[in-house]
Design a protein with these regions (language model features):
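Conserved N-terminal catalytic core of the sugar/cofactor nucleotidyltransferase
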Residues: 2-5, 13, 27, 31-103
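Conserved alpha/beta core of the MobA/IspD/sugar-nucleotide pyrophosphorylase nucleotidyltransferase superfamily
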Residues: 3, 167-249, 255-256
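Conserved kinase catalytic-core helix
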Residues: 150-151, 278-283, 303-402, 491-492
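Helix-rich C-terminal or lid/interface subdomains of diverse kinases
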Residues: 228, 316, 354-364, 441-442, ...
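ATP-binding glycine-rich loop module of kinase domains
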Residues: 245-274, 293-308
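Active-site acidic catalytic loop and adjacent metal/ATP-binding pocket
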Residues: 253, 387-436
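Active-site Asp-x-Gly
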Residues: 414-470
Length: 544
């Protein structure tokens, strides 16, 4: 017996969630949807996976996550446009499914599945769930005609295409057991040749042909449909297996048993990350494997550095990385470094802020109060960044060996050392180096704006005609830790804390396009503009 999962479709109902990857790779909690499916089945069951839209992402992930599983991959040449359909996609796997098998949609999650449907069977069945939604196809069943074994199944009476009422019926959830596989494939071929079936819906096959005389219905007690935006949101809300991270649609972090698997949609990113990693691996968790779009390392039992953080440990962390050479100066062409620095701080930030202003139709053409601080209209973000680059600290910036997300949320403490988890592929066009001041700016950002507060909506933003009020909940250690960071950068590197604070503001401004339609977006913008203004005024006073 085999398990057949089709992942070839484009997932159009999921909009931007499938812009950069396959719908089976959408993350719910710690895992992508396809892992929730596979993990519900016995480890010795052979998998047949159809691949199409971003199929290479699915294959790379499964090879890393399940290296010991027997998996047959079936590439579907036409998964979008004329001639494509679920029927066509399934037919591509026919030669690999010449025995009884279970078919499972790649957007259907059922918990405790082995307790509800048979893994070994001698009849054909459809799996359904009681719901009032009219979005789904359904089938009627004879409640008085049921088996007496562990898995109660009922005589299936009739199928319906999206009926007006589901009273007394079960919604088809995209799981079925095919025992009479020869008859199944015969009917699939008939359906494919029938013009009425040139649609994406394989349920039409069951609806038209009724498939088998002994087709039975099995009812499950839970079901999550991740094939639409509302279903994904509900699944993420209910998921108990979760961790704090602000997700991006083109990147992902998965935890699969004893592995951490990171995903990067853009080709070339992983190659650059590996090149950078080879220079700074003493500070990182060792990479165990990687592919074109994924890298993998072992999950270790260590505290996230932000847990139980306190001023003593914070200062210890800063000194640990200083003493071990994380911020040692590197020899690099100064002209190249300065060009990359300008593009990173100026071009990138202005591009991000322009995206934000265009999206929200916001102009900087009048005075504004943020938290009752007057910011004159002359102090646009573009103007303030221009003034920032005239600072002696900007001009004297030294190239160092690390570039990444130097924040407590992306750092582990194993009792002996601190481990960095999130290094970046490059500092503009420089792969192996970065700007130490950016690291301090990111850490300063994290002390105020941490994942826990952001993910749990522990922030406020109130907009009035000429005044905006913003705040975010911070832990009680933050004020003292910021003072420690201030002393650290001023004492060890002779850098103004206001300069670091300005970089923090740049970080916030640059994050805004990542969270359009999320209240975090405006919070970051107004926090960033206020911090830019206050830091710039203080820097000017220092230099006068």
């Amino acid at each position: 017996m085999k398990l057949f999962i089709t992942t070839s479709g484009i997932g159009s109902r999921l909009l931007d969630l499938t812009k950069y990857t396959n719908k089976s790779m959408i993350k719910i909690g710690k895992k992508p949807v396809i892992s929730y499916i596979i993990d519900e089945y016995p480890e010795d069951i052979e998998l047949v996976i159809s691949l199409g839209y971003y199929g290479d992402h699915v294959k790379q992930y499964l090879d890393l996550a399940y290296p010991n599983r027997k998996i047959t991959y079936v590439w579907v040449d036409n998964y979008d446009g004329p001639g494509s359909s679920q029927v066509y996609s399934q037919l591509q796997a026919e030669q690999y499914l010449q025995e009884p098998f279970i078919y499972h949609d790649c957007d259907t999650i059922v918990e405790n599945l082995q307790d509800q449907i048979p893994m070994d069977f001698d009849y054909n069945f459809l799996v359904g769930y009681e719901t009032n939604s009219e979005l789904y196809d359904a089938f009627d069943y004879d409640i008085n005609n049921k088996t007496k074994d562990k898995f109660e199944s009922y005589k299936l009476i009739k199928t319906y295409m999206k009926p007006d009422s589901l009273v007394g019926m079960l919604s088809f959830i995209g799981i079925c057991g095919i025992y009479d596989y020869k008859t199944f494939w015969e009917n699939m071929h008939k359906a494919y040749e029938d013009e009425r079936f040139k649609t994406p819906y394989d349920f039409l096959v069951y609806h038209e042909y009724q498939m088998f005389d002994d087709l039975r219905a099995i009812k499950v007690n839970n079901w999550t449909d991740t094939g639409n935006i509302a279903g994904v949101k509900e699944a993420r809300k209910k998921c108990k297996d979760n961790f704090f991270i602000l997700d991006k649609i083109d990147q992902g972090i998965f935890i699969i048993k004893d592995k951490v698997i990171k995903f990067f949609a853009k080709d070339g990113v992983v190659d650059n990350l590996i090149t950078h990693y080879n220079k700074i691996n003493q500070f990182c968790q060792p990479i165990t494997n990687y592919t074109k779009n994924f890298l993998c390392y072992d999950f270790i039992d260590a505290d996230n550095a932000i847990n139980n953080m306190n001023p003593v440990r914070f200062e210890k962390m800063l000194n640990y990385f200083k003493d071990n050479g994380l911020w040692e100066s590197q020899n690099v062409d100064n002209n190249l470094f300065n060009k990359c620095k300008d593009k990173f701080y100026i071009n990138k930030t202005l591009d991000r802020v322009n995206q934000f202003k265009e999206f929200y139709n916001i102009n900087e053409d009048k005075d504004i109060y943020i938290n009752d601080v007057l910011i004159p209209k002359e102090y646009t973000i573009e103007y303030m960044i221009s003034e920032f680059t005239k600072s002696k600290y900007y001009k004297e910036t030294k190239c160092t060996g690390w570039h990444g997300d130097f924040v407590l949320d992306n750092m582990l403490w194993d009792g002996n050392k601190f481990i960095l988890l999130d290094w970046r592929e490059k500092f503009d066009n420089i792969i192996e180096y970065g700007d130490m001041n950016y690291d301090f700016g990111k850490m300063n950002h994290n002390l105020t704006f941490n994942f826990s507060s952001a993910c749990n909506d522990l922030f406020t933003i109130k907009e009035y005609e000429d005044n905006v009020y913003v705040s975010i909940l911070a832990d009680n250690y933050v004020y003292e830790c910021r003072n420690i960071l201030k002393r650290f950068v001023e004492t060890n590197y002779n850098i103004s804390y206001d300069y670091i604070n300005f970089i923090t503001a740049i970080c916030w401004i640059s994050m805004t396009p990542l969270y359009f339609l999320n209240p975090l977006c405006k919070l970051l913008f107004y926090m960033g503009k206020l911090t830019m203004y206050q830091s710039l005024i203080n820097m000017k006073k220092e230099e006068d």
